[in-house]
């Protein structure tokens, strides 16, 4: 079976768009990781279209975050169900991606909701 537009021949990639032209110019399209802050409103049905990238042969991965510091990559436990619904809404309405990552480094304290960052020194 030939690879789909979501299955690159290469394992390398970049974090966030801006340098993908280097892979394309070399004839070696790889992965492109997007990071999205979605919040946890279960009624929000907004989405993104990643087909401008996937249609060029780039494989798109999207990390779904509740937010960034101090909101937390995932919300407080009381909002888990709302965040799950928001993620489901986003995935169902978005195009050009089939690899989804929920949250980022949840074992890293600064990624938790309400985390306080201590300055070193």
Please give the residue ranges for each predicted region:
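A cross-family glycoside hydrolase active-site/sugar-binding cleft signature
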Residues: 13-17, 33-35, 61-65, 100-103
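Structural motif corresponding to the early beta-alpha repeats
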Residues: 49-51, 55-77, 102-103
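Boundary/entry segment of secreted carbohydrate-active catalytic domains
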Residues: 1-40
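Alpha-helical scaffolding within the catalytic cores
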Residues: 16-22, 41-51, 83-89
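Short, well-ordered coil/turn segments that N-cap beta-strands
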Residues: 7-10, 28-30, 56-60, 95-100
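Active-site cleft segment of glycoside hydrolase catalytic domains centered on the general acid/base Glu
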Residues: 43-45, 70-121
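Short, low-complexity, polar/charged sequence segments that are solvent-exposed and flexible
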Residues: 30-35, 51-54, 82
């Amino acid at each position: 079976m030939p690879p789909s537009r979501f299955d690159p021949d290469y394992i390398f990639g970049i974090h966030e768009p801006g340098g993908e032209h280097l892979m394309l110019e070399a004839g070696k399209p790889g992965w492109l990781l997007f990071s999205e802050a979605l919040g946890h409103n279960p009624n929000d049905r907004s989405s993104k279209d990643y087909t401008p990238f996937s249609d060029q042969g780039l494989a798109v991965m999207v990390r779904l975050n509740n937010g960034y510091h101090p909101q937390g990559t995932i919300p407080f436990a009381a909002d888990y169900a709302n965040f799950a619904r928001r993620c489901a809404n986003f995935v169902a309405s978005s195009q050009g991606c089939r690899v989804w990552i929920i949250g980022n480094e949840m074992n890293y304290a600064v990624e938790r909701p309400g985390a306080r960052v201590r300055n070193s020194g």
